[in-house]
Amino acid sequence: MNENIIKLINDICWWIPFRSKRNLLRNQLISTITDNMHVKNREIYQFIKKTIDLTTNCDDLETKKRIFKENICLVEIGIFSYCNRKCWFCPNSVIDRHSDNIQLKEEIFLKILNELKDINYSNGIRLHRYNEPLYDIELLIKRIKQVKEYLPNCKIQINTNGDYLNLEYLIDLKDAGIDSMLINYYYNGSDKNIEFNLPQIKSNMNKLMQKLKLNYHIDNESDNSIIMKSKYYNIDITYSSINMNILGCDRGGVIDVKSKIRTAPCFHPNMQVSIDYDGIYTLCCNIRSDVKEHENYLIGNVENNNIFELFTSDKIIEFRKHLLRGNSKKIGACTYCSM
């Protein structure tokens, strides 16, 4: 143990008049600090090991599966394309997700689930990507049940704007087996000049909670955001409203929001898989396969490739090497990312 730490422990204990008690406290402090140092050393070792795994080329499929399972916390799948809104802070304001509704092929969806089943995946599954999942409730319920069949231990999440949400849908979602739902209240989705008026926003959010017959509490509120929490049987419900003028993200350079050049490292491609409705695996949740400027950030198609191969591909490894560098300016779609 470091001599300075020993000296500090002695300084703490010196005033105890009885040698036996003084030595007892001294030994307890040394033991506690030593144990904590061992824990911290193990954490550092695991972090280094994972970083090496995620930035090193590998040919063995079983090793690729291990790396995936040890790192991925969330798999995000767009089961269809349609969204009923064109919010200014979303790429759907400039990309057409309104004219047609294109479904992810069922065989691709089941292929993803089958591959995840092969490693007993038990972390998060999010069934939406820049679409409104409740627009097609029948398909959503079907996909939830399929996830439950293939991956019974995973946690199923959905994000919704709440426009279609009613008590009947909530009951259907509960019966199907989702674990959590994030409802977003977009107070200025159609007009970015509408100010964040907290009393008015709270009043409007309360109307939906009353409609759903849900009790709730305010988990957090500030000058630019409010988060309500509720529970419906086994569904954890978060209802939030955020001032996107202040807290919004540029979504890979598509949206003009105030943000500084990013120099912090990014870990999203290490922990999350994002798959669009066309089966394209993208670098992160901010990258979309239907944005032309994002073409270089598309990792591959899960229809023709194993998800573990894509997660450990040469292309994504090179992105990780760049994104993991601290105190260095990020480039391209990542330049102004605030997530």
Please describe what each predicted stretch is.
Residues 67-251:
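Conserved glycine-rich "GG(E/T)P / GGGxP" loop and the immediately following alpha-helix
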Residues 275-276:
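Short, acidic, Ser/Thr-enriched surface-loop or helix-capping motifs
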Residues 266-269:
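Short, small/polar residue-rich loop motifs at catalytic or cofactor-binding pockets
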Residues 262-264:
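Nucleotide-sugar-dependent
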Residues 4-98, 259, 285, 305-339:
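N-terminal pre-core extensions flanking Radical SAM catalytic domains
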Residues 206-256, 286-336:
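C-terminal accessory region of radical SAM enzymes
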